[in-house]
Amino acid sequence: KELNSNHDGADETSEKEQQEAIEHIDEVQNEIDRLNETA
């Protein structure tokens, strides 16, 4: 219900947030790969 009340600018923010999340996931995956190499 809270998401629907914010639906006016949802498209604009969701796209930016999605890209930021993808970039963050890439960083985390890179860190995991590094940890796996040292393990």
UniProtKB/Swiss-Prot annotation:
Q: Where is this region: Disordered?
A: 1-39
* GO annotation, cellular component aspect: cytoplasm
Q: Does the keyword Cytoplasm apply?
A: yes
The disulfide bonds in this chain are: none
Query: What range does the record give for the signal peptide?
Result: none
Main location, first listed in the record: cytoplasm
Regarding protein family, the annotation reads: To human SET/PHAPII protein.
> What does the UniProt function comment say about this protein?
Has a role in the physiological regulation of fucosylation processes.
- List the protein's name: Fuctinin-3
Which organism's genome codes for this protein?
A: Rattus norvegicus (Rat)
Q: What is the lineage of its organism?
A: Eukaryota, Metazoa, Chordata, Craniata, Vertebrata
